[in-house]
Amino acid sequence: MKGILGQKIGMTQIYTAQGNKVPVTVIEVKPNVVTHKFENTKDGYVALQLGAFDQKERKFKKPEIGHFKKSNTTPKRFVKEIRNMDGYNLGDLVKADIFKSGELVDVTGISKGKGFAGTIKRHNQKIGPKSHGGGGGSKPVRQTGSIGDIAGNKVLKGMTMPGHLGNVQRTIQNLEVVKVDIKNNILLVKGSVPGPKNCFLIIKSAIKNLPSREAIELVNIKEAILKNQLLESAKKYGAEVSVDMKIHEMEEIIHAAMKEKEKLEQEAKQNAEKSNSDDDVRKEAEKLNKNKEDKGE
């Protein structure tokens, strides 16, 4: 088992090399610090306590500050245990590179709070008839309906009734890791995860232990745009390039074609100037000959 703590940034969409659109959740995964290590001999189970996202010391009590000092780190805002995770020592950093593209993970977070909600929204019940006696008075369209038989004398537990909706811990299983960006501490996960923007998340390897999927081949939008621009430039200078080439190869070929075109234009200009000068000399000679002929006459 392996896991890491992160923060939800939001959702976006990316494109594969085949042109398919993939909805992903962007999770910021800053390096986590191992703040405590649980062992079988001492605690009865194996786990690592991870801490992420710095917080001011004045918001913590002295015992809590001392707990973080044991791992030689600053107080952390989000601290959670990852069961059955081992291989790290106190104070070590856990980074996003523990996951790879194509792996399946379980993401746990606190769902969005919806407040007090009726049974239609809370339990997806059917709306009542809007005619034949329904839709007003003693029979509103969105009423709860039956909550038990007349002889029961009580309401059984588990009946779908109005109440508080959301703001509870939820886990979505088997989400695919699309991309791991170590440089920016970003994890892209396919699909949606529980909670609003900026909520804290626990990302763990899938408990169902399903096989990893083939990594999605993504397209680099900036690179694709630059290649299109280079293709247009190649048409202008008559260079032969293809999309399969690397950018620096395309630039070298286009640069060589541009130099060749400039050279040809320069030669054409010089030839034109030479031709014009020859015409001027010829005209001057004809003029002198004509003057001589006029004097001889």
From Swiss-Prot:
It comes from the Bacteria. One of its GO terms (molecular function) is rRNA binding. InterPro entries: Ribosomal_uL3, Ribosomal_uL3_bac/org-type, Ribosomal_uL3_CS, Transl_B-barrel_sf. GO terms for biological process: translation. One of its GO terms (cellular component) is cytosolic large ribosomal subunit. The keyword RNA-binding applies. Keywords: Ribonucleoprotein, Ribosomal protein, RNA-binding, rRNA-binding. Residues 124-143, 258-297 are annotated as: Disordered. The keyword Cytoplasm does not apply. SUPFAM superfamilies: Translation proteins. Part of the 50S ribosomal subunit. Forms a cluster with proteins L14 and L19. Belongs to the universal ribosomal protein uL3 family. PANTHER family: 50S RIBOSOMAL PROTEIN L3 (PTHR11229), LARGE RIBOSOMAL SUBUNIT PROTEIN UL3C (PTHR11229:SF16). One of the primary rRNA binding proteins, it binds directly near the 3'-end of the 23S rRNA, where it nucleates assembly of the 50S subunit. This is Large ribosomal subunit protein uL3. It comes from Mycoplasma mobile (strain ATCC 43663 / 163K / NCTC 11711) (Mesomycoplasma mobile).
